[in-house]
Amino acid sequence: MPATDTIIEVDGDFIHQIPDRSKLKRGQTPQAFHLETISHAYEIALKDEHFKVTDDCGVVVKYLPDVPVYVVTGEESNMKLTYKEDTYLLDKFFQLRKSELNEIPLNESQLKGKVAVIFGGSYGIGEHTARMLQEKQAKVFCFSRSMNGVDVGKKEQVADALKKVFLQTHRIDYIINTAGVLNKEPLMSSDYQTIYNAVSTNYMGTINVAMEAYAYLKESKGKLVFFTSSSYTRGRAFYSIYSSTKAAIVNFVQAIAQEWEPFGIAVNCINPERTKTPMRVKNFGTEPENTLLSAEKVAIATIQSLVSEFTGQVIDVKRNEV
């Protein structure tokens, strides 16, 4: 990888010279050599009482100078654990690891006859996802408070909805939860009932859907999809409850994806940029169209996640990449 930091050559406590950075690269592991080559290099090196090199490349270059060592392009996410502080950085890196679905095609043959349940399917992302799945010949069942009185914050209502679908279709392949509540206001202006309702829908609703979905998706080796927000990485003023529940959803998805992978259940989380939905318009008013993602594009990414092999991933959806 290109050297981005300032590299200095010192003489004691003073800079002797600064090498030309354009000629420097950062080496990464792994380093690979023919067994015969590396064995011969170390055979010579171990006879040298002044042996000081710290990596295999250095051993080969110093002790077998006629052997060319080819360099390939590295990857920024290939981080080396050297110092104690690196463990913290690597932990954060894996927490924020994301995936994108740009190259996954949507074929009717993959979705025809599949049974999908969408919670929060009455408008916005849920409505567009339902419509697109139906266009691909999937059987779609939508539930929401406004459509048929189903509140994901109430476990028994989620259970009844899934049971009704299963009794009718005898299988459930996909379960998608787009239900969410956003109230844009300072925390100290919020009453406890409003806070409770938001947590009940956004977070407890996620848990309820997951727990009630488990048996059906275990049988079908199905897919479970939830939604987060770009605010999950850093809390935002005036919607602390919303952003904190979205952070909780990411952590929850990553955890149950590991638990349920042995049973063939894939669990992912869609992370769209600011999206034009009725909920956003209600809270933020009219915004420039070119600054918002369309609900249709988020729906496409949602369906792509259903036909992907991903699990435990936070899937970014961006305006310029969909």
Annotate each PLM feature.
Residues 1-72:
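Conserved core of the sugar-phosphate nucleotidyltransferase
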Residues 122, 130:
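N-terminal Rossmann NAD(P)H-binding glycine-rich loop of SDR-like oxidoreductase domains
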Residues 178-184:
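Conserved NAD(P)H cofactor-binding loop of Rossmann-fold oxidoreductase domains
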Residues 186-187, 191-196:
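Substrate-binding pocket helix/loop in short-chain dehydrogenase/reductase
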Residues 210, 245:
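Active-site helix of classical SDR
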Residues 215, 258-259:
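Alpha-helical segment proximal to the catalytic Tyr-Lys
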Residues 269, 285-322:
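C-terminal helical subdomain
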